[in-house]
Amino acid sequence: MLLTDPVVLENPFVRLEPLSPAHADDLTDAREGLEYAWYTSVPASVPDEIERRLAERDAGRMNPFAVVSDGRAVGMTTYCGIDLDSPRVEVGYTWLSPRVQRTAVNTAAKLLILGHAFEACEVIAVQLTTHWHNRQSRAAIERLGARQDGVLSAVRSCARRLRTNAPAARS
């Protein structure tokens, strides 16, 4: 199986579905309360961000998922930086509704996406990327067993702003 193949991943806590325009209303509701989160990839316009991620998917560079909990889309996560000639991938552009943060949803989603990458797609390393200032996300990444690999300054974000990333890897 390839990292770019559409797939549904599911466990008792969360379901990861291929992102589609059908998720727009739920995701627009889910982003409420995240206006403060300047350091993460919460989109200003959910429909525009879905369109952007689907264009990246169609170009073979990204495989975006809607994170679904209790029947509603509550966030997004993505395989990105896909290079089918390299046995590694990045997981990023993740954001979750405040109502599911610090619940089992994020950990369950990350375990699904990591398991799929390592087991079904046979990658040897996964990079999880977050903003340096996003301490909550960095702590969650560490709980998954990933270790921080350094700090990258002046990286362009999807919002076309420069940011400082704290990449971590699990292999």
Which ranges hold each PLM region?
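A cross-domain feature marking catalytic cores of carbohydrate-active enzymes
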Residues: 93, 130, 150
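Short Gly/Pro-enriched loop/turn and capping motifs at secondary-structure junctions
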Residues: 133-134, 147, 155
